[in-house]
Each structure stands twice: as structure tokens, then as C-alpha cells.
């Protein structure tokens, strides 16, 4: 029995050590799995030597441990889930930060591209604006030059037209009396009545001709030309009937006075000059009129005009003052004309030396052999005309000088004075005297040159020539007007074409720039849309992946929870099955124990010794099971009653062979250890005590509730059963 007690104590001690050291969860779980398989000793009696050992803890503590372990597992799982969620949140935060950095980089790159494109577009726009400004300035310069050119010919055409008054006409007409030579005026004073009558009739015929009604009113300059043409010349007087009354000296009228503006050119060298040609052998007067064709007139523009040095006529101081404001006009005075026979010849106030010095320029060989010579007249050029398109509207007139050749059959009553003899022109009166007859002057000399012819003696011829001149001038003017209009129209068309081209080019450039801007804007929009679409797709893909991962994690968590729940259910089912098996075994043991106690009751009372004394004293014994199922601290109540109870239990658990053993000196063998120890593992065969115990009323082991609610029978029933058993034993 001592060995049995030691074995029982060893088993209980192992159980107590197991429950008293909950160091690790794995060990506890292993304990929970191995605890149901451990045998529970229900020996009711032990010796007093083992009374100090701790009893097994109640099964309620195991349920609490399981609940605590389950709670710890739940907390651990919650911690793991929280850690996983934290990791997920950190990953999402990192992904979001990476996405934001990526977006910032893309935005910065797009902004840089936009700024670069704007700078390039601004540079292109600036260049285009500069080109447009340059084109505009060039176009304005062309238009300005064209307008200046178109206005200047119009002004010159108006200035040179036959019907418009000439500039400085007042000075011309104020000096009209001086434009004739003295001899012509003297000739007009001393003309014969027959000639006057003839001239008057010719003048009347000219002025009253039917062609005059068709013509416009003559300008003052034209009137002066007509009056000079109607003035009789020396050749006409020589051929007239009154030639005998005239002296042998020839006289000439003043040449045709042409304003210098008839010779115009851009270069002073190209300006035409009046020239006088000597006669070839006849004393007749010839006048070369303006050509009808424009080509011949242009060719004639470059022919220089030559004036003989003897044809210069000095002006009086009054005339110099009057003509000084118009230095550009050249008035070609006529050569001095000898007086008629009836007129006294004024004496020259010049000494012969001065006269010879003045006339030294003209070569003179003999009085009868006279040859004229030419001399160019230099005048101040006018302001250069920027457009030489407008030509002179006044036809050029070439005046031939008429000289008296040697041997001309003129019969003068007195011999003619030598042609080379200088004749001093009288100087005019004081400036206040308007008389046309000049007074002699010592500073004025006239070279002896042949006289010039001023026109024809026939009034019809003069009228015809004048009409022809006017017709040619009108045709020339109309032609020039047409050419000017055509040129202006051409210039205008060119300007319009240039403006149209500039406008088209500007519109084309603007359209191209607008199209380029639209394309760039469209490309930017497409790029932005594409980027947004890519970002959206990436975000959706990440969202789908995140949701998928979350679903997978949730599925794994559910699977793990389901697996844990199934394992827990299996474990609970196994424990329940083991508990039921233990309950059945306990019931069988209790049943066998009750049968053994009832069978051995009488034999125990007949024995002499301590047991009989204890029975007779009637002391109550404390049941063993309540002591074994004491409070959770595992301590058992140590008392003599407990020792006696253990002795009685050991006695009851003895085999039937004990009855056959002899009782020496009336004492039972109590200190001998039984060889047979009750050990009922799962599936073991019942011993002989189990076979003999057939009473099912007494349970072998107290009923414990494995559930928290305690659905099975309570522990007090076991206590009641133990008390009844003890009473029956007593």
C-alpha cells in the first residue's frame, strides 16, 4: 500500500507540478492534451507518512486556463491583425507618397515644357512682329515715294501746261518792252505808213481769223510770241516796196524768248541750251518748229542751246533789280539793230580801245565777210526733279541767224557801216523812268554778230504755225497726261498688289500661327487626357490589386479562423469523450468498491485489534473524498480521522486472500504493501476488484463540469455519495 500511495502521490505530484508551473503556452496546451489520458487514483486510504502531499487541483482551474489561453490567443491574433493592418497602412502611405511625388515630377516637367513652349512662341511672335513692322515700314516708304513721284509730275504738268500761268510771268511781262532790241523798237517807230498799213491788216486778219474762235484765249506769253511774230523783220522790209527808203543796214527783231524752264533735266549737264546757227548763204528767215512725235522731241531735249556772245544785252540797274529774284530764267536779248536811214545814229561814248577789248572775242576779218560763232550760256540749274518722266511741254525752237552776205544786191543810199564796228547801246534812263529807250552806258558793250530771225512775215503762216504748235502741244500734253495716268494706274495697281500680298502673307502667317497654337493646345489636351487616363487606370489597377490582396488576406484569415474553430471543436469533442469514458470507469470502480465493502463488513468487525476498537468508540470519520476535493489550494486536512479513513480504505481494497491470512495475536497486517495497485488506464481490463464490485449506486469519481455553465451534475452529489459510503462502512 505504501508503494501504491507513493505511486499515487507521484502521479498527483506530477499533476500538481504540471498545474503549478504555467510557464509556456505550448507546455500548457500539451498538458491539456495529456491530462485526460493520465490515470486518476481513487485510493481512499493512505498512510500517515504521505499525509503532507498536495492533492490534485480541481478541474475548474483547467477550464479557466483554457479560457485564459484562448483569450491570449485571441489577443495575439488581434495583435497580429493590427500589426498587419499597420503594415498595410504604411505600405499604402508609402505608395501614396510615391504617387504624389510622381505626380509632382510630372507636373513640374509639364510646367517646364509649357514655359519653354511659351518662350519659344513669344520669340517667334516677336520675330514675326518685327518682320511685319519692317514690311510695313518698307511698304509705307514705297507708298510715300510713289505718292511723291505721282504728285511732282502733276505739279510740273500744271506748271508747264499751255493754259496755266507761268511762275514769274509778272516779271516776264514787266520786262516785255526790254525783251525787244532797240533797233526793233526804233524800227516800229519809224516804219513806213505802207508797211504799217500792211501790218495792221495782217494783224487784223490774224486776230479776226475764224481759227481764233475755235482756239482758247491766248495767254500773255503766247500774246507776246504772236506780237513778236507779227513784228516786221529786216528781210521783209528789204523785200517790200519801200525797200529803197530803208538804209543798207539790216535790222533784226528780238529772238523768240523761251523760259529757261523749257530745258529741264535731273542733271544740269542734260539741260537743253538754245543755240543759234549761222545762215549758209541766204538772207531769209527760217524757224524750226517743235516736232510732232514724242520720240523726236526727247531726242531734241539733249540738243544744247547756243547764244552768240554778241547777242548778250546788258540790263539797266532797274532791270537788274527787277530780275534778280528769278535767277533761273534766262532772257536772251536781241542784237542791236542799226537805225533806219532817217534816224540819226547816236555817237558811241566808248573809247576805241574799250570797244576793241569788248569785241575781241568775236573774230572779225573784214566788214564784208562776217561769220557768226556760237557761245554757250551757263545758267543756274533748277532744282533737280526726282522724276524725269514729265517732259517739256514747250516745243524747242531753233532760231537761225540771218546775215547779209558779201555781195548781197542791196542798194542802200549810204554805204553800210562796217559790221565789225562796235555799237554802244544807250543806257536806260533812271530806274523811275519807265521809258523803254535806254541811255548810253560806258559799261555795256555788244558784240557784232549776225542778226537773228524771229518769225515769218506772213500772218496766215504765223497763224498756221501757231495753231500747229498749239495742236502739237495739246497732243503732247494729252499724250503725257495719258502716260501719267497710265503710270499712276500702274503704280496704284502695284501698290494695291503689294498691299494685297502683304495682307495675304500676314493673314497666312496669322492663320498658320493660330493653327499651330490650336495643334499645340490639342496636343496638350490629348497629353493631359492620356496622362489622366493612365493615372486613372493605374489607380484602378492598384485599387483592384489592393482589394484583391485584402480579399485574399480576409479569406486566409477566415480559413485560419475556421481551421482553429474546427480544431477547437475537435479538441472539445475529444475531451468530452474522454470525460465520459472516465466517468464510466469511475462508476464501475465505485460500483465494485461498494460491493467489496458490503461483502467484507462482517469479517472486519470480527477481527481483534485497533480496528474493532475504533469501531466501538463510534468516532465519526471524515470522508476521504471531501478531503481530496478540498479548496483549490491543493492542501488536504491532516487529522487522525483522515489517517483512520485511509487505513479503512486500504483494508477495503485488499484482495479476498487477506481473509485467509492468519491473524497473529489478534492484529491484522496493516503495514504490508499490496502487490496489486489499481491502475485503470483507457481501455485496460478490470481487475478482480472491479469484477467483484457490482453496486452501481456509488460513483467512483466525482462528476466535473467541463463547460463553463456546468451542465452536468454538481460536485455536492459526489460529497453526498462519499458521506453515505463512509456511513455504510462505519
Curated annotation (Swiss-Prot):
Name of the protein: Ensconsin
Region Disordered, residue ranges: 1-183, 291-388, 403-669
Species, as recorded: Mus musculus (Mouse)
Family recorded in the similarity comment: Belongs to the MAP7 family.
Biased composition (Polar residues): 37-52, 645-655
Keywords (A to Z) from UniProt: Acetylation, Cell membrane, Coiled coil, Cytoplasm, Cytoskeleton, Isopeptide bond, Membrane, Microtubule, Phosphoprotein, Ubl conjugation
Residue(s) of cross-link: Glycyl lysine isopeptide (Lys-Gly) (interchain with G-Cter in SUMO2): 273, 295, 374, 378, 398
GO function terms (MF aspect): signaling receptor binding
Composition bias type Basic and acidic residues, residue spans: 62-151, 294-304, 373-386, 461-610
Coiled-coil spans in chain: 89-152, 460-589
Post-translational modification Phosphothreonine, affected residues: 231, 277
Amino acid at each position: 500500500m505504501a508503494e501504491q500511495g507513493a505511486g499515487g502521490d507521484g502521479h498527483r505530484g506530477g499533476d500538481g507540478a504540471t498545474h503549478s508551473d504555467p510557464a509556456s503556452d505550448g507546455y500548457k496546451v500539451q498538458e491539456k492534451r495529456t491530462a485526460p489520458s493520465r490515470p486518476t487514483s481513487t485510493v481512499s486510504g493512505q498512510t500517515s507518512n504521505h499525509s503532507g502531499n498536495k492533492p490534485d487541483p480541481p478541474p475548474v482551474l483547467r477550464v479557466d486556463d483554457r479560457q485564459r489561453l484562448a483569450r491570449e490567443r485571441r489577443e495575439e491574433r488581434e495583435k497580429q491583425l493590427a500589426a498587419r493592418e499597420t503594415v498595410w497602412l504604411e505600405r499604402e502611405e508609402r505608395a501614396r507618397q510615391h504617387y504624389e511625388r510622381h505626380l509632382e515630377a510630372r507636373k513640374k516637367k509639364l510646367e517646364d515644357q509649357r514655359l519653354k513652349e511659351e518662350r519659344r512662341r513669344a520669340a517667334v511672335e516677336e520675330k514675326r512682329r518685327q518682320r511685319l513692322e519692317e514690311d510695313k515700314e518698307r511698304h509705307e516708304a514705297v507708298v510715300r515715294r510713289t505718292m511723291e513721284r505721282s504728285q511732282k509730275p502733276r505739279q510740273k504738268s500744271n506748271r508747264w501746261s499751255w493754259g496755266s500761268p507761268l511762275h514769274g510771268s509778272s516779271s516776264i511781262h514787266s520786262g516785255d518792252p526790254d525783251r525787244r532790241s532797240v533797233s526793233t523798237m526804233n524800227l516800229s517807230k519809224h516804219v513806213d505808213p505802207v508797211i504799217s498799213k500792211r501790218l495792221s491788216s495782217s494783224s487784223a486778219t490774224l486776230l479776226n481769223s475764224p481759227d481764233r474762235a475755235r482756239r482758247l484765249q491766248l495767254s500773255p506769253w503766247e500774246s507776246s510770241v504772236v506780237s513778236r511774230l507779227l513784228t516786221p523783220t529786216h528781210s521783209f522790209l528789204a523785200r517790200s516796196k519801200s525797200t529803197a527808203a530803208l538804209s543798207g543796214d539790216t535790222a533784226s527783231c528780238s529772238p523768240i524768248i523761251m523760259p529757261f524752264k523749257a530745258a529741264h533735266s535731273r542733271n544740269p549737264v542734260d539741260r537743253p541750251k538754245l543755240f543759234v546757227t549761222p545762215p549758209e548763204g541766204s538772207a531769209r528767215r527760217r524757224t524750226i518748229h517743235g516736232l510732232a512725235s514724242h520720240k523726236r522731241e526727247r531726242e531734241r531735249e539733249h540738243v544744247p542751246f547756243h547764244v552768240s556772245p554778241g547777242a548778250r544785252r546788258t540790263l539797266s540797274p532797274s532791270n537788274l533789280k527787277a530780275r534778280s529774284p528769278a535767277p533761273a530764267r534766262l532772257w536772251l536779248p536781241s542784237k542791236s539793230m542799226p537805225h533806219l536811214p532817217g534816224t540819226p545814229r547816236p555817237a558811241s561814248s566808248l573809247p576805241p580801245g574799250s570797244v576793241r577789248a569788248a569785241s575781241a572775242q568775236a573774230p572779225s576779218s573784214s566788214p564784208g565777210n562776217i561769220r557768226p560763232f556760237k557761245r554757250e550760256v551757263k545758267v543756274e540749274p533748277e532744282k533737280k526733279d526726282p522724276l524725269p518722266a514729265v517732259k517739256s511741254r514747250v516745243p524747242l525752237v531753233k532760231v537761225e541767224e540771218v546775215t547779209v552776205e558779201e555781195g548781197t544786191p542791196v542798194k542802200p543810199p549810204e554805204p553800210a557801216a562796217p559790221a565789225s564796228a562796235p555799237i554802244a547801246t544807250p543806257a536806260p534812263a533812271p530806274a523811275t523812268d519807265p521809258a523803254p529807250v535806254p541811255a548810253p552806258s560806258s559799261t555795256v558793250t555788244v558784240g557784232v554778230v549776225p542778226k537773228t530771225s524771229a518769225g515769218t512775215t506772213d500772218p496766215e503762216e504765223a497763224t498756221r504755225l501757231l495753231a500747229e504748235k498749239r495742236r502739237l502741244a495739246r497732243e503732247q500734253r494729252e499724250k503725257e497726261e495719258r502716260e501719267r495716268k497710265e503710270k499712276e494706274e500702274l503704280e496704284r495697281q502695284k501698290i494695291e498688289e503689294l498691299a494685297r500680298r502683304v495682307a495675304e502673307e500676314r493673314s497666312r502667317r496669322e492663320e498658320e500661327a493660330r493653327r499651330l497654337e490650336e495643334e499645340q493646345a490639342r496636343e496638350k489636351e490629348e497629353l493631359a487626357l492620356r496622362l489622366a487616363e493612365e493615372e486613372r487606370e493605374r489607380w484602378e489597377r492598384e485599387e483592384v490589386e489592393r482589394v484583391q490582396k485584402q480579399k485574399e488576406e480576409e479569406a486566409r484569415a477566415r480559413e485560419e479562423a475556421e481551421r482553429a474553430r474546427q480544431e477547437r471543436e475537435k479538441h472539445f469533442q475529444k475531451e468530452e469523450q474522454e470525460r465520459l469514458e472516465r466517468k464510466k470507469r469511475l462508476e464501475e470502480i465505485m460500483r465494485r468498491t461498494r460491493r467489496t465493502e458490503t461483502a467484507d463488513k462482517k469479517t472486519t468487525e470480527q477481527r481483534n485489534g485497533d480496528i474493532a476498537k475504533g469501531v466501538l468508540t463510534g468516532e465519526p470519520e471524515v470522508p476521504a473524498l471531501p478531503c481530496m476535493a478540498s479548496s483549490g489550494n491543493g492542501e488536504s486536512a491532516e487529522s487522525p480521522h483522515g489517517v483512520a479513513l485511509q487505513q479503512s480504505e486500504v483494508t477495503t481494497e485488499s484482495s479476498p486472500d487477506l481473509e485467509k491470512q492468519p491473524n497473529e495475536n489478534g492484529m491484522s497486517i496493516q503495514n504490508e504493501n499490496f502487490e496489486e495497485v489499481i491502475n485503470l488506464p483507457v481501455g485496460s481490463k478490470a481487475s478482480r476488484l472491479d469484477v467483484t464490485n457490482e453496486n452501481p449506486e456509488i460513483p467512483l469519481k466525482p462528476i466535473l463540469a467541463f463547460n463553463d455553465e456546468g451542465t452536468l451534475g454538481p460536485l455536492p452529489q459526489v460529497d453526498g455519495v462519499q458521506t453515505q459510503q463512509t456511513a455504510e462502512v462505519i
